[in-house]
Structure formats: structure tokens, C-alpha cells
Amino acid sequence: MKFFLIFLVIFPIMGVLGKKNGYAVDSSGKVAECLFNNYCNNECTKVYYADKGYCCLLKCYCFGLADDKPVLDIWDSTKNYCDVQIIDLS
């Protein structure tokens, strides 16, 4: 019974604290274009308050965005490619 009560308290908190990865979009629905990783890291961390960012397929891909930040809908294969690339950079 205690485990069930703890689960009910902790489970909603886990969903609130989650972060996501993706191409962050501005208020007009556009993604920042890039050629260099430094530009994207600054764009993602200072404008979108993500953990870090880099240039993936000529667009700024942000890692660790807050759940309320809008991201561009992309194919799963593109997302997987960009996620793997950022893991390799760490």
C-alpha cells in the first residue's frame, strides 16, 4: 500500500521534470538555420534555454528543451540521427 501511494506522488512529478530534444521553433514557426555548432549552442542555450545545441542537417538542434517549448515535427529517423550525433559529441 505504501508503494502505491509513493508511486501516485512521484509519477506525476517525473512527467513534469522531463525534457525533450528537437528543432526549436520561434514565434513565427521557423527554425534557426546554421553552418557551425557554436552558433547553435548559443542559440539553443540563450534563446530557448535548452541544455545545449548543435547544427544537425543545417538546422539548430536543441538538447534538453523544456516540455512547453514548441519543436518542429520531424521524421523519427531524422530525430534518431540528430540524437545519436549529439550523444557522440558529449
Swiss-Prot record:
Pfam families: Toxin_3
Gene3D superfamilies: Knottin, scorpion toxin-like
SMART domains with a match to the protein in the record: Knot1 (SM00505)
GO biological process: defense response
Task of the protein: Excitatory insect beta-toxins induce a spastic paralysis. They bind voltage-independently at site-4 of sodium channels (Nav) and shift the voltage of activation toward more negative potentials thereby affecting sodium channel activation and promoting spontaneous and repetitive firing. In vivo, induces paralysis on insects. When tested on mice, it does not show toxicity but has an analgesic effect.
UniProt note: domains: Has the structural arrangement of an alpha-helix connected to antiparallel beta-sheets by disulfide bonds (CS-alpha/beta).
Protein name: Beta-insect excitatory toxin BmK IT-AP
Source organism per UniProt: Olivierus martensii (Manchurian scorpion)
Source lineage: Eukaryota, Metazoa, Ecdysozoa, Arthropoda, Chelicerata
